[in-house]
């Protein structure tokens, strides 16, 4: 439930379902207050419909801290609704009326602490074992459901009529385990609860510690340190050794059980399930041990109440017949008897008030109205007897089955009319009838004393309540700060993750954009290569066509010139017949035409070879250029990815530094807050201790003042006592004198009687004078002795109190010093753990970066290797195809960039890598420059002239043909391919084996 909701608000459906909407005043009748504490009051009542007896715990949630009270009520109701076990109090429902919650539960006879108060002695070991066994079963059930009681003690362990043990008072319980709140009753608190805010969380083993203290309480009537101030007890528990059983009469099983429950370190302490297997609770014992104990306690309660009743009746009768003087005497006697019966509890003084803050209804003080003034002795006696019945029954009780149908008015309405001679038997029967309406194990004096203690010790109880409230508030502040810092840390981490994700998305988009750009560039380049190849072919074909036309024109001119020369030669030779001349001329023409035809055919063949060779060269060069472009694009992509990964790693390192700085700042903030809260807590503890010291000194001074004021009355009483003794002595002496006189008168003659009487008179006077002197001396000695004794006693009490308060103050200082040292050690440990955690995170981050860099390097190497292998396969396939077509790799690579640029103006853009070799780090080796286009080829035909020249031209052409033959090309290509393959293999292998990051810039 949120703390901001209004107290008593039922708008939340989950909260509204916890409470019944009926009017509790109509459902329950005969409400009688039987106890109250800081939470409110406890009543027993009857269910109007079933006449069942129930206990109603009224808790107000108005006034100061109403929200906190309301949350405590809601928490307790939720807790009670969740539990259902034979060893836990039965929950019947909760109602709301006028800002008060009515928590309805079953009745029980009383608590284990009531047994100690009634019998005034410890319980037997088998009785302690039976009570402990039942409590352990209830605790095991709670702990199995991750619930913690946090206030186990004898006052919260209730007993029913059949001897069933039940756990009660879940106002301090925790629904979650582990917990870290400062709750419970000081003397029963486990060390880890006291140090909850300083050292961390605790679990159900705190109930095991409290159970061990409860065992000591049942064995020694009081828990350890009960004679100490509650705050001092807290400091003592937190830093000193665990308590043990003092007496040697207990068995080893019991001692070992208590020692195991009171292990200082929670990890060494057994769980409730493990304790159920302990021999102490498993030892055989009578099944009726608790029933017998309850019956003995009920009988003792009845006798004690009857004794009180008879004393009060006697006082009233004596007051009526003997007057005030006798009343005073009887009061003194009764006080002496009362001190003898209840002095053990009263000697605790104000130190006993703390446990009553959170105890259950069975062990809480009851509120009984004071007796009204009576007009006569009879009415006063009737009122006392009637009210006494209520007081003696003011406890958490269980109705006997055979007594369910009792009258509506259980109190007696008639009394004997004559108080001087009452029928004693009938009066006792009336008293027993009132008592037997409800069974109880609590005496009226216990209820009255708890009322007085609750009223007297409100200041100390409020101090402890304020201290608990402060500790809870500090815990809430620390938790609020931790939640705030955790939210800030989560927000910061989310922002960093978002920034990293944004950067990765941007990098992914940039990389995708780059890949698309590269794809478009490659597609564009492929189209450009296809167009350039087409233009290149057209250019060569145009040049060859022009060359062919020029060649044909040249042949025509040469043919005409040759024809004219032949005609001139024939004209010069007149001796040759004309027919023979015509035949020789025709033959020469035919030979020349045949030669020209061969020359034309050779030219066409060479042009065709040249075209095929140059196209093949162009394709190979374009393939190498495309490979270089692919390498450049892959290089750019890998460099881009490397840059992005470096930027991502730099951001991760920056984010790590930012998170580290924030974590250290948060830890410093928490530790600073913790130090401030510890300082404030220590100041409050010191202030409380000083106030407690002043209050104890003030109470002692008040006591001494009362003793001094009452000293004259005491001295008067002593003087009267001495005077009475003197009077008795005088009477004795007078009787002795008379007896002696009579004896002497009988034994002496009458003539001597006068002298004897005179002598006896003088002797009597002398002895009375001596007795008077002794009386004065006794009075003076008594006065001086009493005054001196009072001063010495008061001085001794002052010294004892000062020593006790000084010890408690030193204990507080030691406790606070220990807390400071533990806090400093905890802070150093937290800083060291944070440094280790940050260092480990940094190491993991660096390892992750290194792994990513290695993965990126492997990916880079694999990309390069696969690219080079693919390009090598493409070159090898191209060269194999070239060899099949009859082209040598060396010839294909023998084209100069000058000839290439001169013959094809548009080809200058492709000559940026003249050698066609690799880039700065990797690529394809390429042969020498290609031959120029459009120039006469080496070994080509000479211009037409003499036939010898023709023969030479043919021979040189044949040599050219041999050199460019498929066999030569194949041999050259195979050699070049082998060298190229070796170079490529060596380059890739060296790059992969080195494993180093290759630079592309």
Curated annotation (Swiss-Prot):
Residues noted as binding ATP in the record, renumbered to the chain: 34-42, 57
Instruction: Report the PROSITE patterns cross-referenced here.
Output: PROTEIN_KINASE_ATP, PROTEIN_KINASE_DOM, PROTEIN_KINASE_ST
Localization terms from the record:
Cytoplasm
Q: What's the EC number here? A: 2.7.11.1
Give start-end ranges for the coiled-coil region(s): 458-651, 754-877
Q: Does the keyword DNA repair apply?
A: yes
Q: Where is the composition biased (Basic and acidic residues)?
A: 375-388, 577-586
Instruction: Give a Gene Ontology cellular component term annotated to this protein.
Output: cytoplasm
Question: By what name is this protein known?
Answer: Serine/threonine-protein kinase TAO1-A
Species: Xenopus laevis (African clawed frog)
Corresponding gene? taok1-a
């Amino acid at each position: 439930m949120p703390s901001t909701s209004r107290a008593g608000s039922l708008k939340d459906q989950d909260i509204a379902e916890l409470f019944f909407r009926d009017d509790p005043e109509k459902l329950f009748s005969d409400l009688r207050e039987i106890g109250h504490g800081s939470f409110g009051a406890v009543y027993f009542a009857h269910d109007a419909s079933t006449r069942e007896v129930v206990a109603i715990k009224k808790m107000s949630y108005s006034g100061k801290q109403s929200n906190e009270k309301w949350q405590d009520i809601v928490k307790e109701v939720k807790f009670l609704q969740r539990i259902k076990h034979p060893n836990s109090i039965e929950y019947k429902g909760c109602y709301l009326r006028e800002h008060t919650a009515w928590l309805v539960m079953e009745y029980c006879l009383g608590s284990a602490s009531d047994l100690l108060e009634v019998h005034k002695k410890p319980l037997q070991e088998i009785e302690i074992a039976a009570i402990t066994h039942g409590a352990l079963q209830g605790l095991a059930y709670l702990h199995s459901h991750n619930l913690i009681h946090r206030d186990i003690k004898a006052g919260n362990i209730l007993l029913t009529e059949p001897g069933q043990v039940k756990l009660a008072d879940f106002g301090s319980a925790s629904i979650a385990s582990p917990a870290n709140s400062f709750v419970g009753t000081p003397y029963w608190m486990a060390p880890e609860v006291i140090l909850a805010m300083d050292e961390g969380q605790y679990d159900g083993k705190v109930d095991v510690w409290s159970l061990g203290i409860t065992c000591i309480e049942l064995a020694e009537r009081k828990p350890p340190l009960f004679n100490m101030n509650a705050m001092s007890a807290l400091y003592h528990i937190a830093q000193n050794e665990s308590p043990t059983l003092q007496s040697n009469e207990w068995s080893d099983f019991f001692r070992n059980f208590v020692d195991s429950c009171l292990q200082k370190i929670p990890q060494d302490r057994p769980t409730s399930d493990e304790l159920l297997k302990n021999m102490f609770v498993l030892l055989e014992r009578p099944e009726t041990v608790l029933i017998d104990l309850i019956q003995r306690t009920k009988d003792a309660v009845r006798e004690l109440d009857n004794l009180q009743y008879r004393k009060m009746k006697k006082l009233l009768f004596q007051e009526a017949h003997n007057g005030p003087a006798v009343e005073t005497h009887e009061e003194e006697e009764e006080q002496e008897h009362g001190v003898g019966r209840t002095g053990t509890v009263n000697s605790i003084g104000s130190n006993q008030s703390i446990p009553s803050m959170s105890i259950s209804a069975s062990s809480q003080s009851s509120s009984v109205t004071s007796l009204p003034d009576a007009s006569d002795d009879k009415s006063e006696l009737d009122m006392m007897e009637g009210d006494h019945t209520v007081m003696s029954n003011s406890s958490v009780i269980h109705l006997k089955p055979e007594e369910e149908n009792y009258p509506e008015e259980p109190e007696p309405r008639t009394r004997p009319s004559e108080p001087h001679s009452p029928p004693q038997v009938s009066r006792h029967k009336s008293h027993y009838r009132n008592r037997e309406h409800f069974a109880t194990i609590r005496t009226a004096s216990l209820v009255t004393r708890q009322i007085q203690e609750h009223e007297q010790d409100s200041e100390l109880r409020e101090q402890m309540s304020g201290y608990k409230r402060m500790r809870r508030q500090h815990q809430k502040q620390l938790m609020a700060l931790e939640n705030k810092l955790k939210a800030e840390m989560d927000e910061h981490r989310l922002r960093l993750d978002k920034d990293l994700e944004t950067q990765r998305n941007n990098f992914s988009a940039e990389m995708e954009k780059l890949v698309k750009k590269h794809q478009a560039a490659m597609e564009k380049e492929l189209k450009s290569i296809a167009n350039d190849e087409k233009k290149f072919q057209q250019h060569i074909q145009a040049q060859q066509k022009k060359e062919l036309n020029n060649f044909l024109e040249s042949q025509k001119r040469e043919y005409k010139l040759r024809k004219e020369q032949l005609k001139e030669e024939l004209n010069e030779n007149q001796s040759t017949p004309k027919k023979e001349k015509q035949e020789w001329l025709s033959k020469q023409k035919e030979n020349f035409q045949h030669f020209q035809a061969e020359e034309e055919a050779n030219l066409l063949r060479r042009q065709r070879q040249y075209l095929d060779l140059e196209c093949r060269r162009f394709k190979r060069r374009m393939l190498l250029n495309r490979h270089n472009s692919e390498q450049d694009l892959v290089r750019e992509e890998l460099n881009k990815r490397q840059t992005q990964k470096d930027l991502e790693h730099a951001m991760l390192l920056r984010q790590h530094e930012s998170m580290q700085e924030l974590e250290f700042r948060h830890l410093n903030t928490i530790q600073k807050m913790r130090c401030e809260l510890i300082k404030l807590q220590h100041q409050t503890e010191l202030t409380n201790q000083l106030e407690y010291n002043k209050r104890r000194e003030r109470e002692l001074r008040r006591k001494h003042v009362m003793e001094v004021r009452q000293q004259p009355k005491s001295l008067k009483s002593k003087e009267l006592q001495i005077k009475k003794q003197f009077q008795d002595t005088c009477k004795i002496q007078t009787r002795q004198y008379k007896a002696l006189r009579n004896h002497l008168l009988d034994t002496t003659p009458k003539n001597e009687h006068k002298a004897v009487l005179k002598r006896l008179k003088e002797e009597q006077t002398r002895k009375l004078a001596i007795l008077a002197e002794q009386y004065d001396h006794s009075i003076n000695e008594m006065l001086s002795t009493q005054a001196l004794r009072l001063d010495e006693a008061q001085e001794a009490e002052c010294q004892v109190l000062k020593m006790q308060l000084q010890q408690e103050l030193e204990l507080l200082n030691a406790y606070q010093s220990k807390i400071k040292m533990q806090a400093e050690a905890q802070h150093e440990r937290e800083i060291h753990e944070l440094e280790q955690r940050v260092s480990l995170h940094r190491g993991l981050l660096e390892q992750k970066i290194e792994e990513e860099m290695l993965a990126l390097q492997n990916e880079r190497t694999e990309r390069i290797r696969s690219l080079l292998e693919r390009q090598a396969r493409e070159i090898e396939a191209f060269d194999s195809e070239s060899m099949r077509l009859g082209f040598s790799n060396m010839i294909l690579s023998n084209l100069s960039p000058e000839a290439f640029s001169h013959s094809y103006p548009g080809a200058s853009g492709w000559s940026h890598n003249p050698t066609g070799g690799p880039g700065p780090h990797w690529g394809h080796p390429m042969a020498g420059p290609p031959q120029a286009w459009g120039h006469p080829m080496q070994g080509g035909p000479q211009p037409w002239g003499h036939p010898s020249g023709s023969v030479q031209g043919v021979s040189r052409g044949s040599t050219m043909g041999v050199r460019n033959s498929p066999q030569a090309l194949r041999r050259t290509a195979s050699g070049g391919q082998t060298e190229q393959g070796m170079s490529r293999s060596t380059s890739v292998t060296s790059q992969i084996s080195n494993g180093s990051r290759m630079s592309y810039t």
